C-alpha cells in the first residue's frame, strides 16, 4: 500500500457478502470515501472464502481519488497490496465480535502505519448495540454447507489459525 493511502478515515458501508459489495459498486453507491466492511466471512461463518475479487473494485475507487479501505473478518491473498485493509478480525462477526456491531455510516479510522482500526463514534452506544445475526445465504444450501457445519461450528478464530483440530496447548 502506497504511503499516501495508509491512513483512511471514512464512514463505514457494511455488507454481509462480497456479492453485495459488487452490486453496490455497480449501482454507483460506493463512489465516495468509504471503509467497506464485509462481515460474516470468517472460519465459523463460511470458511473464510478468498475476498481478492474486491481489490479491483476498491482499486478503481481509489484510482478515482477516493480514500477507501476494506475491513473484514475474512481473508485476502498476498496479491491484494494496493488497498489498505484490516483482515482476519477476531473474534469474528458470527461469534459476536465487534465487526457485527458496525452499521452503515459509522465513522472509522484505519491506520496501516500503527496497525489500528478505530471506531470514532460514541463508544458507549457502540458497545450497547446488539450484534447483527448471520443469516446463511439460502442459495448455498446443498453445496456442502450441511456437510461441513460441524467443522464451522468448531473452527477456532482466525487469530489462532482457524483450525477445528484441538491439540494440547491450543485455545
Identify the residue ranges that each predicted region occupies.
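Feature captures the catalytic cores and cofactor-binding loops of soluble hydro-lyases/lyases
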Residues: 1-171
Amino acid at each position: 500500500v502506497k504511503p499516501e493511502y495508509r491512513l483512511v478515515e471514512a464512514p463505514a458501508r457494511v455488507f454481509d457478502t462480497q456479492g453485495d459489495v459488487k452490486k453496490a459498486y455497480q449501482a454507483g453507491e460506493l463512489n465516495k470515501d468509504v471503509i467497506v466492511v464485509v462481515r460474516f466471512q470468517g472460519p465459523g461463518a463460511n470458511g473464510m472464502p478468498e475476498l481478492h475479487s474486491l481489490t479491483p473494485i476498491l482499486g478503481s475507487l481509489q484510482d478515482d481519488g477516493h480514500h477507501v479501505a476494506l475491513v473484514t473478518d475474512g481473508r485476502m491473498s498476498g496479491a491484494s497490496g494496493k488497498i489498505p485493509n484490516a483482515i482476519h478480525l477476531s473474534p469474528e462477526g458470527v461469534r459476536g465480535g465487534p465487526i457485527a456491531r458496525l452499521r452503515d455510516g459509522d465513522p472509522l479510522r484505519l491506520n496501516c502505519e500503527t496497525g489500528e482500526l478505530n471506531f470514532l463514534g460514541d463508544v458507549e452506544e457502540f458497545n450497547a448495540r446488539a450484534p447483527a445475526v448471520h443469516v446463511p445465504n439460502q442459495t448455498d444450501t446443498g453445496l456442502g454447507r450441511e456437510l461441513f457445519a460441524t467443522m464451522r461450528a468448531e473452527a477456532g478464530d482466525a487469530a489462532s489459525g482457524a483450525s477445528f483440530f484441538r491439540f494440547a496447548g491450543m485455545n
